C-alpha cells in the first residue's frame, strides 16, 4: 500500500469514543481515569519541556511561545491545561463529536486552543510542525502504529520533543489495565482496550528512531489506591511514558 493511501484511523475506535463524547469533562464519568491521570502527565510534560527548552517550571506560563500538537485530543482534557501553561496548542482528533465537545468547553473556560477535526496524516501533509507533539493514550487505538508514529515524528521540529503514553503489551497489563480496570473495578467501559492492540516500548522506539528521534527518557506510571493518585515508577510493565527528541 502506498503511503498516500495509508490511514492511521481505526473507525471502530473513532466511533467508540464519539459515542462517549458527552462525558469527556465529567470527573466521575467514563473518562474518570484520565482526569485522575492528568496531574502526573502534566507535571511530566512541563518538567521535561522546561528542561529541554530552558524554561522555569515554577513560572505561571512555562511553555510560553512553544507550539504544541495534542494528537488524538479527545475532549481536550490535556489540551486546555497545556494551553494555560502558555503554549500555542493545536488539538487534533478525527472525531467531529469530540472536537465539538472540546471546542464548546474551551470557549466556556476561555482556554485558547485551536481544535481541528483532522488526522495526523492530514496535518503532516499540510506541512504543520511543532515544538512538542503530545501522543498520549492514542497509539493503542490507531490502525497502523508504525505509520502513525512516523507521521507524528515528521511534525517534530529540530530540537523538539514527542511524548508518548500508552499501555504495555504484557500479561500484567492484560490483568490490571484490561481485566481489572474494565471488568472488575469498572473504571473504563468494557472494550476500551484490546490486548492485541497494546504496544511495547520497543515498538514505539524503533519507528521514532528511524525518523531521527532519540529516546531521552522512559518512565512507568502506576495508580496508588491508598493515595488515590497516579505516580511515576520504574515499572513499565503496565502504563508507561516515553520522551523522544529530534536533534537541533
Swiss-Prot record:
S-adenosyl-L-methionine binds at residues 41, 72, 93, 136. Keywords: Methyltransferase, S-adenosyl-L-methionine, Transferase, Ubiquinone biosynthesis. GO terms for biological process: methylation. GO terms for molecular function: 2-polyprenyl-6-hydroxyphenol methylase activity; 3-demethylubiquinol 3-O-methyltransferase activity; polyprenyldihydroxybenzoate methyltransferase activity. It is an enzyme of class 2 (transferase). It comes from the Bacteria. Pathway: Cofactor biosynthesis; ubiquinone biosynthesis. It catalyses: a 3-demethylubiquinol + S-adenosyl-L-methionine = a ubiquinol + S-adenosyl-L-homocysteine + H(+); a 3-(all-trans-polyprenyl)benzene-1,2-diol + S-adenosyl-L-methionine = a 2-methoxy-6-(all-trans-polyprenyl)phenol + S-adenosyl-L-homocysteine + H(+). Gene3D superfamilies: Vaccinia Virus protein VP39. Its EC number is 2.1.1.222, 2.1.1.64. The keyword Transferase applies. Belongs to the methyltransferase superfamily. UbiG/COQ3 family. HAMAP family: UbiG (MF_00472). O-methyltransferase that catalyzes the 2 O-methylation steps in the ubiquinone biosynthetic pathway. This is Ubiquinone biosynthesis O-methyltransferase. It comes from Rhizobium rhizogenes (strain K84 / ATCC BAA-868).
Amino acid at each position: 500500500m502506498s503511503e498516500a493511501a495509508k490511514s492511521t484511523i481505526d473507525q471502530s475506535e473513532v466511533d467508540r469514543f464519539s459515542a462517549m463524547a458527552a462525558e469527556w469533562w465529567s470527573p466521575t464519568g467514563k473518562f474518570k481515569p484520565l482526569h485522575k491521570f492528568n496531574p502526573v502527565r502534566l507535571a511530566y510534560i512541563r518538567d521535561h519541556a522546561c528542561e529541554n527548552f530552558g524554561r522555569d517550571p515554577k513560572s505561571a506560563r512555562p511553555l510560553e511561545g512553544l507550539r504544541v500538537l495534542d494528537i488524538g485530543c479527545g475532549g481536550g482534557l490535556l489540551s486546555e491545561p497545556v494551553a494555560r501553561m502558555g503554549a500555542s496548542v493545536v488539538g487534533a482528533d478525527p472525531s467531529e463529536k469530540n472536537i465539538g465537545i472540546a471546542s464548546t468547553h474551551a470557549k466556556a473556560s476561555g482556554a485558547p486552543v485551536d481544535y481541528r477535526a483532522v488526522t495526523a496524516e492530514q496535518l503532516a501533509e499540510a506541512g504543520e510542525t511543532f515544538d512538542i507533539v503530545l501522543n498520549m493514550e492514542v497509539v493503542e487505538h490507531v490502525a497502523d502504529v508504525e505509520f502513525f508514529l512516523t507521521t507524528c515524528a515528521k511534525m517534530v521540529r529540530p530540537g523538539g520533543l514527542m511524548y508518548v503514553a500508552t499501555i504495555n503489551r504484557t500479561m500484567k497489563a492484560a490483568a490490571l489495565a484490561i481485566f481489572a480496570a474494565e471488568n472488575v473495578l469498572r473504571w473504563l467501559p468494557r472494550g476500551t482496550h484490546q490486548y492485541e492492540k497494546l504496544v511495547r516500548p520497543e515498538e514505539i522506539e524503533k519507528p521514532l528512531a528511524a525518523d531521527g528521534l532519540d529516546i531521552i527518557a522512559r518512565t512507568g506510571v502506576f495508580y496508588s489506591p491508598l493515595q488515590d493518585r497516579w505516580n511515576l515508577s520504574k515499572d513499565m510493565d503496565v502504563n508507561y511514558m516515553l520522551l523522544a527528541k529530534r536533534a537541533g
